[in-house]
A protein has these predicted regions:
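Non-catalytic terminal accessory segments
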Residues: 5-6, 161
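Core catalytic region of metal-dependent phosphoesterases/phosphodiesterases
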Residues: 6-12, 25-31, 35, 40-123
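Binuclear metal-dependent phosphoesterase catalytic core
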Residues: 26-29, 190, 194-236
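Active-site-proximal beta-strand elements of phosphoester/diester hydrolases
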Residues: 30-39, 133-140, 210-214
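Short, acidic/polar N-cap/turn motifs at the starts of alpha helices
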Residues: 22, 124-128, 200, 221
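Structural motif
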Residues: 59, 171, 208-211
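Divalent metal-dependent hydrolysis catalytic cores, especially in the metallo-beta-lactamase
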Residues: 65, 177, 181, 215
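Conserved catalytic scaffold of divalent metal-dependent phosphoesterases
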Residues: 73-74, 79-173, 177-187
């Protein structure tokens, strides 16, 4: 499985389908763990990584908001957990706020070398990953700041329907909203459904899906089996 990471100078743009910046193909295997919205909770993030490793995930992806803009301790430890475990990650709105604060000279009680390393880490994060018709993003999979600030789940299917109309993604895995939720496109109809805890979701070829994984800070993560084409919600 080939995956492409999209990086870009982040600007506000009213066009949701702006062309992405640079493409860097990566190789993924069949079992993928997904984590989102750990918000500086290093214990919960580590527990998610361990649970997904126990499930023999070949790759683990963090879907953004690794940090919390209001929590400035353990920043370097969080970066170490991500890098030491070879976690792929996309940028969330809280990560962007931390990045901008550091760029604007906020010391955050960090050594200069740690501050520089955290800045480099945040700058390196992709806005989203794609692999064929599968996408991993913090929220909406478009190339602008607005995309990772605006939630897909607003209690209706409006934003999900827009994504289904404007993209070719068969599967989108994202975070931002902290409640696990499924949006399903079937024959032009979009539905909003809870994700069951005990029953794996089997993907159908004639349907499209948006999976909101849920917050690791609240004990949620997910497991994708590409060979079986199933998704499992995992509670810590």
């Amino acid at each position: 499985m080939m995956i492409e990471a999209y990086f870009s100078a982040i600007v506000f743009d009213p066009c949701p389908t702006c062309p992405p910046g640079l493409k860097h193909p990566l190789t993924l295997q069949g079992r993928i763990g997904v984590i989102a919205d750990s918000h500086g909770n290093i214990a919960s993030m580590t527990d998610c990584i361990q649970r997904l490793t126990d499930r023999r995930a070949d790759t683990i992806i963090h879907l953004g908001d690794i940090f919390d803009s209001e929590i400035h301790h353990n920043l370097m430890n969080i970066v170490d957990v991500i890098t030491d475990n070879n976690i792929l990650a996309v940028k969330g709105n809280n990560d962007y706020q931390i990045e901008k604060s550091l760029e604007n000279g906020h010391p955050m009680d960090l050594d200069p070398s740690d501050r520089q390393r955290i800045r480099q880490f945040l700058h390196s994060l992709a806005l989203y990953f794609t692999s064929g018709n599968v996408c991993f993003a913090h929220s909406r999979p478009f190339d602008s700041i607005r995309a990772f600030y605006e939630p897909i789940d607003t209690g209706s299917t409006e934003q999900a329907a827009r994504i289904f109309r404007h993209t070719d993604h068969h599967l989108l895995f994202c975070g931002h909203s902290h409640l696990p939720m499924l949006f399903r496109w079937r024959a032009g109809i979009v539905t909003r459904e809870p994700i069951p805890e005990q029953t794996p979701l089997v993907f159908q070829k004639n349907e499209k899906y948006i999976i909101i994984v849920g917050s690791a800070d609240k004990g949620e993560c997910g497991f994708i089996d590409r060979e079986k084409m199933v998704y499992e919600r995992i509670r810590l």
